[in-house]
Every structure is written in C-alpha cells, then in structure tokens.
Amino acid sequence: MTFERKDVSKLGSDWSDTLVWYAKAVGKLQERPLASRTSWRFLAAMHGFNEVLWSAHGYYSSGEALPSDSDRARFWDQCQHQSWYFLPWHRGYLASFEAIVRSAVVELGGPADWALPYWNYFDPDSRSVPPAFLQKTMPDGSPNHLFVEARYGDGHGIFIIEPEDVSLNALKDHAFIGGDSGGNSGFGGPDTKFNHGRGVNGHLESDPHNTVHGLVGGLEDERHPDDRTTYGLMSIPATAALDPIFWLHHANIDRLWEVWRKRDPQNLDPTDPSWLMGPADRKFIVPDPDGEGITFTATQMLDTKAAPLNYTYQDTSDPLAGSTRKKVRLTGLRLLSDAPMVNFLENKSAGGQVATELLGANASTIKLAGGVSHTRVTLDAASADKVNNSFESVRLLSTTPKEPDRVFLNLENIRGKNDAAVFYVYVNVPNGDDPKDHPENKVGVLSLFGVSDASKTDSAHGGAGITQVFEITSIVDNLQLDESQLSDTLQVQFVARNTVKPEHDITVERVSVFRESL
C-alpha cells in the first residue's frame, strides 16, 4: 500500500481524524519504556540524547533503565547535519517513525492508512504552528500529547513563521552537493562522512529547516544564557524530536526535496557511490514496528513510492513556477546585453567542488547581539577585478556568453550559547538607513540551531562552531546594472530577529567573501 502524506492545514478541521489519532498514538508511544526501540523517547534519542536536558524537561529520570550499550551505539545520536546525508538520513528516520506510529494507531482502533501530515509554513494560511499542537487538552477533554510546555516561540505565545523568515531559494539551486571551500554549499549539503557534528550548512538545511527550529523552539528565559534547559525542545538537536511538531516540520523538508527533484530535470541527486551506499564509517539504522533494526542507505531513499518507503505527498507542485537561479540571473543580466545567452543556462549535473578564490575578509572576530551588528569586509583589488571582468562576455554582446562569477559570503566558525537565535543578514545597506527598508540588500537568514553543541571544545570538531554560506551574487549583479563595480569593501549587517543578549556570547570568527568561477 502507498500512503499519502497530506498538508495538515487541509485536513478539514483543527482536530482532524489524522491529528486525533496522531495524538493518541504519541501517548501510547510515550507509555513505553525508554529502552524499547519503538518508544517515543527511544525514537527521539536517535536524533540526539542529552541526559541533563532530558532530565530537566522530564523525559529521563536518574537511574532509569537505558537501552543496551550496543543499541545506544548503533541507534542513538545519528542525526546527520551539515552533510550531504542530511536529507536521506532524515527520510529514513521519518519513514521508521511513521510506520511505528501507524502501527500504534491501528492497535488503538484507528485507520490502517494513517500517514504523517506535513506543515507547509510557506502557505500564507498556515504560518502558525497548527492549533492542535497548542492546546493542553483534546476535544474530549483528555490530555493532548501533541502539546509540550517547552515550546516557546517568541516567548509570548506567538508561533508564527513570517514571510521574511524563510524562503524557497534553495529550490532554485541545481547543485545537490556543495563544497566546503567558500563557494556554493549546495541544495543538499557538502560531501562528508557520517556527520553528527558540525560544519557547513547546505542550502535547504539552512533555510527553512534551521530557522523554523529556532523560531518554534524559542527561549523561555534570556536572563540565563548558560542554562540550556530554558530553551525550547525544538531549538536544540538533542531535544528537538521530543516535540511532536518536529515530525511535521521534517515531513515538509522531505517534501521539498521531492519538489526540488521534480521541478527541473537538471536537479539531480548525487551518483557518487559513497553517497548512494554510505556512509562507510557508520551505517544508518532504524527500528521497524516490531523493534527489529533495519539498516538503509541513500539508494533506498530515492523512490518514495517503492519499499521501504511507500508514500507520496498531497502536493509536490512547483511553488516557483519554473524559476531557477540561472533563469533569474539571466533575466536581470539581459539588461546588459540583448544576446541570446544559451550557454549561460547549461548545467553541470549534481554539483560538487568548484574552483573558488578568496576575495577578502573582515579584520577580526565580531560579536552579535540584539539590534544591529555590523562588520566591514576588505576585498583584494586584483581579485575584485576578476569578478568585474567576468561580466565582459555579457557586456560585449557575445552570442555564447559565459556566466559571470558567482560570489558568496561566508560566516565562518560561528560559536555561541543561544541555539534559538535568528538574524537577518544584509550587505551594503546605505549608511544611516534602516536595513529593513532595503529588502533588495537582504542576502539571507542566519539561524544558530545546534550552535551550542558545535561550540564545545570537547566536541567532535573541537568547538569549531558552524559555518553559514550566503550567495550574494545578486548584490554584485546590481552593482553592474547600476554601472558600478565591486570595489574594495563590503558592509555586512546582522539584524536580530528574536531575543539575543551579549551574554549569549555569539561570535563569528571570520566574515569572508569568495568568488566561484564557472
């Protein structure tokens, strides 16, 4: 049987049968002991486990029986982030969860075709966390297991994803695989081994994935930045999957992968055997409804209609009506030339490492706090001229122009204590102007989901933090259209979206700019 995952906002009512049965099944899974592979907490710990945080939130009691050392080593702390495995691992994880919940639904007398719904926060009518997740009781007055106390949003009971918070820009990127040398980080992320640690965010993981985590989870009390127990479950990877909304959020991320795959024939998944059959250093494993361990690879995650997945989505239509990064750029640069830019639209398959060059960087580590923070990036004149000169084939009316250089802003080795922090990032806002008055200068949204773990010096990456890449090619293109050029400096501004205090110690070790020559 093939199951259909439906849009939660189109199920007919706030308390549709799908959500009623989901709530009941969550309650059943929560009754199972932690050591049970099909329990709510075991499944959540596969994404991440932190004894201190779980205890503080009431999900673990000191002395409680844990799974065997073997089960913990194989099943727990598996989630893949800052990696090309981000999408296939989470797909297998969701499929396992969905099958276990469906089994519980059937045991409770529910429908055999129950499927996990998705939360499409890009729908203007569905930007808030669904009402069923915000009520303490179900319609019959019984406890609502979809509700959690540790979900804080903006701190005042507001759980809205505003239009400016997230974008679908990731869908415009043809390259699945990104690099880690300053250029495009890719739709799906950089080539890594098993990566439960930190590194460079892929495009879809950065936006909307990370941002939704931070804005939904939020922070209860900003006065105690060292107390991670004051952060919402969704804000921290080690607690995120304890919140029932996590699964609807990730169903939407998984759906967007399908949208990306279908919207353009140039959008290709990797064909590298190390992705298809990897990772070699640790196998992915999930439990089935009987608790048996099932290993999987990315190869098995490519056809959702086939076993072991067996599902479709209610809507995988293209929300951007065919718009791609190259087409958008072509439309703008046609103002420089009337030439038919045929070669400009050629694609080079699934992506990967492309030659990059450092254009420049700021002078020192900067600290981010509330309000507006800023820094200046000094560019090497000769390197900036290479970017400017890359537009010559367009200006000279070539019939086969080469695409000009792409330019990327890198926020390197971000460290801090506030996993829920979100910033809007702008480049070259006119002096004295409010950045919010210049949406054309906004280059993206920075979310620090996972930053506290990545900042620990005893972590797998030695406290290197996380790195975020934003494409700022449009800024450079606009300079050319204004008959100007990339000069010796760029001004970068960070505008806090939510509560950020100096005590959160958020720093960016280096802000750099790279060019990618195609």
Describe the function of each predicted region:
Residues M1-L518:
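C-terminal accessory segments of proteins
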